[in-house]
Amino acid sequence: MTFMTRLFCAGGALLSLTALATIAQADGRDWNDGPVVNVASIRTVDGHFDEYMHWLATTYRKQQEAAKTAGLITSYRVMVVEARTPQDPDIYLVTEYKNWAALDRLGGKFDQVSAQVEGSVEKAAQSEADRAKIRTVLGSRTQQEALLK
């Protein structure tokens, strides 16, 4: 190889690497969009914690596993926390979705999962009404993880 050929090859490689680095930083952000996470805050009625945990370990788990199999969610967790006041949650239900688009038309898709697990949408609705006697949903929040580069 001649000196000029080597020089052109080295220059071309350097130019290619510079272009790749520029493309990688083109959006100017120091993070990428991560999964979307919903956290529901639950407060169990005094004396009914074990009953609610039993429901979570049985029916809820079946629903969430069916939702994972259907590709509706990527993961779920049940977090037991120490409530600081009587108005604080004692359980967080954490559900992870691939992205914001995964939430589009999610209600109808989850109705199908509920019907599959509990027999019908009506039975699932009655089951939810019955759970109101042993727990209160204090609210929920949905957020997106920022994956730092």
Name every feature range the model reports, one short phrase each.
Residues 28-31, 62, 66-74, 96-149:
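An amphipathic, aromatic/His-enriched active-site/gating alpha helix that lines ligand/cofactor pockets
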Residues 26-51:
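Immediate post-signal-peptide N-terminus of mature secreted/exported proteins
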Residues 15, 29, 82-84:
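Residues embedded in well-ordered secondary-structure elements
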Residues 15-24:
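C-terminal segment of classical bacterial N-terminal signal peptides
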Residues 43, 94-96:
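Short hydrophobic/aromatic beta-strand micro-patches
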Residues 1-13:
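Bacterial N-terminal signal peptides that target proteins for export
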Residues 45-89:
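N-terminal, post-signal-peptide region of Sec/Tat-exported proteins
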